[in-house]
Curated annotation (Swiss-Prot):
Reported function: Precursor of non-enzymatic components of the classical, lectin and GZMK complement pathways, which consist in a cascade of proteins that leads to phagocytosis and breakdown of pathogens and signaling that strengthens the adaptive immune system.
The species this protein was found in: Bos taurus
PROSITE patterns in the record: ALPHA_2_MACROGLOBULIN, ANAPHYLATOXIN_1, ANAPHYLATOXIN_2, NTR
Other observations noted: C4 is a major histocompatibility complex class-III protein.
Entry protein name: Complement C4
Residues that bear Sulfotyrosine: Y1414, Y1417, Y1419
Site (Cleavage): R754, A755
Keywords, sorted A to Z: Cleavage on pair of basic residues, Complement pathway, Disulfide bond, Glycoprotein, Immunity, Inflammatory response, Innate immunity, Phosphoprotein, Secreted, Signal, Sulfation, Thioester bond
UniProt signal peptide: 1-19
Main location, first listed in the record: secreted
Ribonucleoprotein as UniProt keyword: no
Positions annotated as propeptide: 674-677, 1447-1450
CDD domains: ANATO, complement_C3_C4_C5
Length: 1741
């Protein structure tokens, strides 16, 4: 009995304990540092009148005494038992409590109240729950001005910063940019005071295609990272877009059934008009892994009608093709049908392409989504199955029958229920299934659609039975709600044995508890929730009650259709209006409140070139970002209350029950597995590629399949492949493609289907290689406007015919962020004109302008077209003469005008087209035609030291010597620069910190990695000098910003050359170089603070360098950039000293980025430097070092503070090699080859002589010597002397000879100038004067050593004139002279060592029989007139492949024109065996006028495995070809070029081959157009030719015709008009071609008159020049009377040369036999009388 009473008492006590009072604690399961935490506190089961006070706070689980937030007090009572608190979490307090030191991101939410201990008899007054914490907070949205960019373009971007509530946030942001390889190229911290940050950066022009990323985060929140991506690829905007539109979004296939396959090909111009032309369509299959197999025999060639055509595949035909591939229709579901279409428009022959890759074979036309159905049953409550049915386009499918089969289990028994219901307008169906209380499990099978349904299944179970019951949330019509609507629900307790008073519920949205509520319980408890913007885009309703001390809960997830932003932003233009280029458009901006509106306009053509995957920011993306803070997982519900709370994203504790801490910030993802299909694709090329498994081998095979633009056998090509592993697959695939091409040719033009069986071109070319064409601007309107409810902008439209999309984003303090629906406007002219001009032409070349007229009106037009008169151009009728052209409706017609430029200038061409009176249409285009002078540009530089303290140096005379090759009537210019401050000139805003950086200091290209580093190195030296001497104020205010920009550009660009292991190669495809990697490590270590680079990445670079060190200390270079043996080093076989010293210098600078002093890597680097120094010291001690190796070794040992004895030996060796000239000290060069010994620099004869300019090697060596001397003795006499010599070696631009000598010299001089800086001010007065044709010209300059004054006065004077300089003052200075003029010949070059030859041939078709190479199909050859049906022969895939690779023009000419306008360039280079190069060589080819090189050809020469060049660049009319070396035997490369605008009488152009590191070592030649080419014929009409020849001389033939000189016309010409300067009777000896001139060498037989040619006597020779475009012919052996004006040029002997022009008298002297005839006797006597009178008496006036 006692036991029984004990049990009864215990049970009663237990029941009472369940009803005990308690505190309930709710909060989001993740804490956001810096964002207030919403905490709900509830008092449960407390007696009436009870008041509980306490506080809530956060703490560190490991440091419980360290609070991570302030304490927030609360007070609860039985009447106010459920409240919501906000607990602030300041960033500073989170750091103080050491949260950042925790390995696991956990924090404790605690409630503290004495009531917990006093009333509940607990041992503590605290209760808590564990939460995760994250520093992610707020929202950052990024926007770029385009979705896709070309390499070399500038990216403009914006960052919008908002807080957790979507309101503007003014925080410090960290913005980073990553390139396509994932390397960080830019990092900066910025402050956005208006919550919008804008910036831009430049994509390097050598960037590989790929996806770049811009990321932003709040600087104090590492997890708040947000990013946007954009694509970088080579493209040109299309003129029209091709779309492939399937009739159905899927292809239905089931066993024994296949639906129809129909597709529409649509082509429209960007401005919306349909394209006329032909569509070529082919099909293939795409596997799940992206593998592509083409279906041979299904190709189609169809004419477009009104811009589109329909292609239908017959079932039998399609199934027959599948059977050939052993593919059954049963294998098709899960695969995709690939469709590729190429459209050629008939008016211009332009081609664009498109592909469709998303057309799936499906077993059902629908998809079934059951994710919104809850996973738990509530016994006795109807279960709601929610299914969403979509079609294959992803759109909701309405009115689709859905069948549901429910199998209900109760113990071992079951029963079935079947339902059928149609989906509503949103594609949703809700089926209510009655569930008796005894049911424990329901198995559901669902099918949607008929007869080929989508199916799905689901099993749901009931929780274990419990006395506390279940909470049912009834929503009669589940659907997404809209803002402003009210959610009405019923709450019901099911299966409960007792009673309770209230239901409690919470609204949770975006990871925060928005509100808490309680509702009295009734028979049917109804609650209402008003949906506002705070609940967008979804929220959770979490309801609970307590019964018997046990919480019972349920939840519901509700999606909200926002429909738009919280505020309002509308962009309105009058879209119904027809806009034309240059029109003003009114853009209306409407907002709900005052806001900043960020605008941008982008050409919609960008979305056609690959930008579709990077669409602009819209509200969908904004809502996705907002919803990313939702911590809930699933549709709601759970087996227990803690599970319900956890699934809704809440943490919960009541002292007895609590939620488990969540495992991660995101929801667990369902693991999905899918069986991969294995379809046997049998195809010739695929089988070939399938032989190789590695990506490298596949790439080599792909390269072998690609045809070169020049004749090479496969064996010759394979011999150039450097990697042995690549050579075999390359050769095999090359031979395979060669055999296919042979078959294609020998079989002739087979049908299209059979041709496709021979070769599938897509297997040879990546789709990314397909270029797209246009010349349109790509974006504009990048601005931020402040708008207060309404604003109207008046915008001027660009001159493009396209469709613009205007984007707008507003930021308001009251309504947050809003992204407007883009406004589109079409810019179009029904009648418009298109005109192309060449990059440049030369004087007296003839070109044909061919404006194309487009008529999109419904009526034919008669149009009058003319070219406006302009000075310097010869035009038909003098300009203004119009041509009448008939342009039919809906067509295009070209009009031809011949033009001859006769003046070297930038000429503004204006073409005007006007309609008739009945059709007042018109258009006008104005473009600049760049007209260059004949010949090639030649430059001369001289440097003088200005020293007024030396009496002999106070007066200088700069001679005016003349070059015999100078172009007559040229532009003779001398630029003079004077400075009294060498540091500020070299390092200031006009030198290393000029807008172009070192690029402006050197006339060298900027392609490879080492050239890229020159953007960084000099700028760092300049910044260091200006920082140390505090002289930034001496320069323009923007100079500091420019320096930062230059450093950032260099850093961004060099990352494109970085390899995964941290090393660097000269090119992207080149193996890593030790020397270059060391160079990068040194410069980036110095730039680390300014570029925000990754120290870890530089540590990887240092580690790679250590791996290149040998055991005995020296470093080796597996792939040298510079052949150091040619630049010093050791005499003998050891060439590693200079390299080892260079790496030591780099590693020393790299110590700054290594970890702390005790790190293993630091010890390894220090040990490496020590071993290398031991090696260097031993070599220095041997005494065999050359001057360069001695200088860099001495500097390396001094820099690293090597042992004293080693440093002293190196110093003594270096000084023993020094040379001195007066007060200057320098080091020359001793090389390994006696033939390469550079002669010592001669000493100047006097202070007034120009300073001799040393080679690059001497400059670099002296710079290292100066760096060593500064460390050895500081600023002392020796350093002064070396710096003085080095300063005077600078070029006119401020640089030196090449990159390395410039980089090292500026580094050394900046260090010297820092050491020698003085604030003392000194003055320098300079007077420059010269006597020219216009008289004496003088300039007076007053300079100081702290002022940069640059004079670039164009002193244009007759050659032979001199410049006198007078110097006064007490400061030294420098005077530099640059002469610039054009020359006719290249005889003064050094082509004895290096050789280059350029030949140009008319369009060449290589055939296997003739050239043992591949035939050259031209895609443009397919075009035969404007009628697409004229294509009588089908297009083979080989033509598509080869033609696409060659297509590079905007408007493809017809086949006949193509053969005339395309030429083949062959560039051959070689050197004599005794001459070496320092390293890289560059061929600079100036193309013939009007031509541009085919990039596709050049890319093949650089990108394939059989690489022929390292790199190429195109700039204007120049093509730069980079070669690693110049061979001793002749080696040639070839590429095609196309002349876009017809040019006649094309003049020769120049080509230069030079040593990059020693540019004076060069060979320069001229080359001309192919013989018998139309390029050499005339294009002009009669009056235009007459105008062009207006300056040409004409031979006088009056005597030949027997005309008598009754009026003395010879004497009038000689003495009155034009009154000549000379008169000679000469005999022509020979004729010679000189560029654009012809030279006649003559011997004087009689001197009649002279002015300045005082040395002219009989039997002397004189040269006469005439333009090659003139028709004058002087025959050798004949005598002529020649009179005219004096020339401005001189021959090699210093005698004047004469230009024959319209002011020249040229008359053939008659023979004695002619003068004996009766007809000519009197005229001959009159001629002899003139010769006698004029020769003895001259002019009598």
């Amino acid at each position: 009995m006692r036991l029984l009473w004990g049990l009864i008492w215990a049970s009663c006590f237990f029941a009472l304990s369940l009803q005990k009072p308690r505190l309930l604690l709710f909060s989001p399961s993740v804490v956001r540092i810096g964002v207030p935490l919403s905490v709900a506190v509830k008092l449960q089961d407390a007696p009436s009148g009870q008041v509980v006070r306490g506080s809530v706070f956060l703490r560190n689980p490991s440091h419980v005494n360290e609070l991570c937030s302030p304490k927030v007090d609360f007070s609860l009572s039985s009447d106010r038992d459920f409240i919501l608190l906000n607990v602030p979490i300041p960033q500073a307090q989170a750091r103080i409590c050491f949260l950042h030191l925790r390995r696991v991101p956990e924090v404790q939410l605690m409630v503290q109240s004495s009531w917990l201990r006093d009333s509940l008899s607990k041992q503590t007054d605290m209760q808590g729950v564990n939460l995760l914490f994250s520093s992610r907070r707020g929202h950052l949205f990024l926007q770029t001005d385009q979705p896709v960019y070309n390499p070399g373009q500038r990216v403009r971007y914006r960052v919008f910063a908002l807080d957790q509530k979507m309101r503007p946030a003014t925080d410090i942001l960290t913005v980073t940019v990553e390139n396509s390889q994932g390397f960080r190229v830019q990092k900066r911290e910025v402050f956005a005071p208006f919550s919008i940050f804008q910036d831009s950066f430049l994509i390097p022009d050598i960037s590989e295609p790929g996806t770049w990323k811009i990321s932003a985060r709040f600087s104090d929140s590492l997890d708040s990272n947000s990013s946007t991506q954009f694509e970088v690829k080579k493209y040109v905007l299309p003129n029209f877009e091709v779309k492939i539109i399937p009739e159905n979004p899927y292809i239905l296939t089931t066993p024994g059934f296949l639906s129809d396959i129909q597709v529409i090909i649509q082509a429209r111009y960007i401005y919306g008009k349909p394209v006329q032309g032909v569509a070529y369509v082919r099909f293939g299959l795409l596997g799940e892994d992206g593998e592509k197999t083409f279906l041979r025999g299904l190709e189609s060639q169809t004419k477009l009608v009104d811009g589109q055509c329909q292609i239908s595949l017959q079932k039998a035909e399609f199934q027959g093709v599948l059977e050939k591939l052993n593919i059954s229709t049963d294998d098709l579901p899960g695969l995709r049908l690939y469709v590729a279409a190429a459209v050629i428009e008939s008016p211009g022959g332009e081609m664009e392409e498109a592909e469709l890759t998303s057309w799936r074979f499906m077993s059902s036309p629908f998809s079934l989504d059951l994710s919104k159905t809850k996973q738990q049953l509530i016994p006795g409550v109807p279960f709601l199955l929610q299914a969403l049915v979509r079609d294959m386009s992803g759109s909701p499918a309405s009115s689709i029958p859905v069948k549901v089969s429910a199998k209900l289990f109760s113990g071992s028994t079951s029963k079935n229920q079947d339902f059928e219901q149609n989906t509503d307008g949103s594609g949703q169906v809700i089926v209510s299934i009655g569930v008796p209380r005894t049911i424990s499990e329901v198995q559901l099978s669902v099918s949607a659609g008929s007869p080929y349904p989508a199916v799905g299944s689901l099993t749901v179970k009931a929780p274990l039975s419990r006395s506390s019951g279940f909470l049912s949330i009834e929503w009669q019509n589940p659907r997404p709600l809209k803002v402003g609507e009210t959610l009405k629900l019923n709450l019901q307790a099911v299966g409960i044995s007792g009673s309770f008073s209230y239901f409690y519920y919470m609204i949770v949205s975006r990871g925060q508890i928005v509100s808490v509520h309680r509702e009295p319980r009734s028979h049917l408890t109804s609650i209402s929730v008003f949906v506002d913007h705070h609940l967008v885009p979804s929220f959770h309703l979490v309801a609970f009650y307590y019964h018997g001390g046990v919480p019972v809960a349920n939840s519901l997830r509700v999606d909200v259709q926002a429909g738009g932003c919280e505020g309002k932003l509308e962009l309105n233009v009058d879209s119904s209006k027809a806009y034309r280029p240059g029109d003003t458009v009114k853009l209306n901006l409407k907002t709900e409140s005052r806001a900043l509106v960020a605008l941008g306009a982008v050409d919609t053509a960008l979305y056609a070139v690959g930008g579709k995957s990077h669409k602009p920011l819209d509200m969908v993306k904004v809502f996705e970002a907002m919803n990313s803070y939702d911590l809930g997982c699933g549709p709601g519900g759970g087996d227990t209350a803690p599970q319900v709370f956890k699934a809704a994203g809440l943490a919960f504790s009541d002292g007895d029950h609590r939620t488990e801490i969540r495992k991660s910030l995101s929801c667990p993802k369902e693991s999905k597995s899918r069986k991969k299909r294995n379809v046997n694709f049998q195809k010739a090329i695929h089988e070939k590629l399938g032989q190789y498994t590695s990506p490298v081998a596949k790439r080599c095979c792909q390269d072998g399949l690609t045809r070169l633009p020049m004749a090479r056998t496969c064996e010759q090509r394979a011999a150039r492949v450097q990697q042995p592993a690549c050579r075999k697959p390359f050769l095999s695939c090359c031979q395979f493609a060669e055999s296919l091409r042979k078959k294609a040719r020998t079989r002739g033009q087979v049908g299209l289907a059979r041709a496709m069986e021979l070769l599938q071109e897509e297997d040879l070319i990546e789709e990314d290689d397909i270029p797209v064409r246009s010349f349109f601007p790509e974006n504009w309107l990048w601005k931020v406007e402040e708008v207060d409810r309404f604003s109207q902008l008046r915008l001027l439209l660009p001159d493009s015919l396209t469709t613009w999309e205007i984007h707008g984003m507003s930021l308001s303090k009251t309504t947050g962020l809003c992204v407007a629906t883009p406004a589109r406007l079409r810019v179009f002219r029904e009648f418009h004109m298109h005109l192309r001009l060449p990059v440049s032409v030369r004087r007296f070349e003839q070109l044909e302008l061919r404006p194309v007229l487009y008529n999109y009106l419904d009526s034919d037009l008669t149009v009058s077209v003319h070219v406006s008169p302009v000075e310097g151009l010869c035009l038909a009728g003098g300009g203004g003469l119009a041509q009448q052209v008939q342009v039919p409706a809906g067509s295009a017609r070209p009009v031809g005008f011949s033009v001859v430029p006769i003046a070297a200038a930038a000429v503004s061409l204006k073409v005007v087209a006007r309609g008739s009176f009945d059709f007042p249409v018109g258009d006008a285009i104005s473009k600049i035609l760049q007209v260059e002078r004949e010949g090639a540009l030649h430059r001369e530089e001289m440097v003088y030291e200005l020293n007024p303290l030396d009496p002999l140096g106070r007066t200088l005379e700069i001679p005016g010597n003349s070059d015999p090759n100078i172009i007559p009537e040229g532009d003779f210019k001398s630029f003079v620069r004077v400075t009294a401050s060498d540091p500020l000139e070299a390092l200031g805003s006009e030198g290393a910190l000029s807008p172009g950086g070192l690029a402006s200091l050197l006339r060298l290209p900027q392609g490879c990695a080492e050239q890229t580093m020159t953007l960084l190195a000099p700028t760092l030296a300049a910044s260091r000098y200006l920082d140390k001497t505090e002289q930034w104020s001496m320069l323009p205010p923007e100079t500091k910003d420019r320096a930062v920009d230059l450093i950032q550009k260099g850093y961004t660009r060099i990352q494109e050359f970085r390899k995964r292991d941290g090393s660097y190669g000269a090119w992207l495809h080149r193996d890593s170089s030790t020397w270059l990697t060391a160079f990068v490590l040194k410069i980036l270590s110095l730039a680390q603070d300014q570029v925000g680079g990754s120290a870890e990445k530089l540590q990887e670079t240092a580690t790679w360098l250590l791996s290149q060190q040998r055991d005995d200390g020296p470093f080796h270079d597996p792939c040298p950039v510079i052949h150091r043996e040619m630049q010093g080093g050791l005499v003998g076989s050891d060439e590693t000293v200079a390299l080892t010293a260079f790496v030591v210098i780099a590693l020393h600078h790299g110590l700054a980025v290594l970890p702390d002093k005790n790190s293993e890597q630091l010890r390894r680097v220090e040990n490496s430097i020590s071993r290398a120094n031991t090696f260097l010291g031993a070599k220095a001690t041997s005494g065999l070092l050359g001057s360069h190796a001695s200088a860099i070794t001495a500097y390396a040992l001094s820099l690293t503070e090597a042992p004293e004895d080693l440093r002293r030996v190196a110093h003594n060796n270096l000084m023993a090699m020094a040379k001195d000239i007066g007060d200057k000290l320098y080091w020359g060069s001793v090389t390994t080859s006696p033939s390469n010994v550079l002669s010592p620099t001669p000493a100047p004869r006097s202070p007034a002589d120009p300073i001799p300019q040393a080679p690059a090697m001497s400059i670099e060596t002296t710079a290292y010597g100066l760096l060593h001397l500064l460390l050895w003795e500081g600023k002392a006499e020796l350093a002064d002397q070396a710096a003085s010599w080095l300063t005077r070696q600078g070029s006119f631009q401020g640089g030196f000879r090449s990159t390395q000598d410039t980089v090292v010299a500026l580094d050394a001089l900046s260090a010297y100038w820092i050491a020698s800086y003085t604030a003392e001010e000194k003055g320098l007065n300079v007077t420059l004067s010269s006597l020219g044709r216009s008289g004496l010209k003088s300039h007076v300059l007053q300079l100081t050593n702290h002022q940069v004054h640059r004079l670039e006065e164009e002193l244009q004077f007759s050659l032979g004139s001199k410049i006198n300089v007078e110097v006064r003052g007490n400061s030294k200075g420098t005077l530099k002279v640059l002469r610039s003029y054009n020359v006719m010949d290249m005889t003064n070059t050094t082509c004895q060592d290096l050789q280059i030859e350029v030949t140009v041939m008319g369009h060449v078709e290589y055939t296997m029989e003739a050239e043992e190479d591949y035939e050259d199909y031209e895609y443009e050859d397919l075009l035969a007139g404007d009628d697409p049906e004229a294509h009588s022969r089908p297009v083979t895939p080989l033509q598509l492949f080869d033609g696409r690779r060659n297509r590079r023009r905007r408007e493809a000419p017809k086949a006949a024109e193509e053969r005339e306008s395309r030429v083949q360039y062959t560039v051959c280079i070689w050197r004599t065996g005794k001459v070496g190069l320092s390293g890289m060589a560059i061929a600079d080819i100036t193309l013939l006028s009007g031509f541009h090189a085919l990039r596709a050809d050049l890319e093949k020469l650089t990108s394939l495995s059989d690489r022929y060049m390292s790199h190429f660049e195109t700039e204007g009319p120049h093509v730069l070809l980079y070669f690693d070396s110049v061979p001793t035997s002749r080696e040639c490369v070839g590429f095609g070029a196309v002349q876009e605008v017809p040019v006649g009488l094309v003049q020769p152009a120049s080509a230069i081959l030079y040593d990059y590191y020693n540019p004076e070592h060069k060979c320069s030649v001229f080359y001309g157009a192919p013989r018998k080419s139309k390029l050499l014929s005339t294009l002009c009409s009669a009056d235009v030719c007459q105008c062009a020849e207006g300056k040409c001389p004409r031979q006088r033939r009056a005597l030949e015709r027997g005309q008598q000189d009754l009026e003395g016309y010879r004497m009038k010409f000689a003495c009155y008009s034009p009154r000549v300067d000379y008169g000679f009777q000469v005999k022509v000896l020979r004729e010679d071609s000189r560029a654009a001139f012809r030279l006649f060498e003559t011997r004087i037989t009689q001197v009649l008159h002279f002015t300045k040619d005082a040395r002219a006597t009989a039997d002397q020779t004189r040269n006469f020049l005439v333009r090659a475009s003139c028709r004058l012919q002087l025959e050798p052996g004949k005598e002529y009377l020649i009179m005219g004006l004096d020339g401005a040029t001189y021959d090699l002997k210093g005698d004047p040369q004469y230009l024959l022009d319209s002011n020249s008298w040229i008359e053939e002297m008659p023979s004695e036999r002619m003068c004996q005839s009766t007809r000519h006797r009197t005229p001959c006597a009159q001629l002899n009388s003139f010769l006698q009178e004029y020769g003895t008496q001259g002019c009598q006036v």
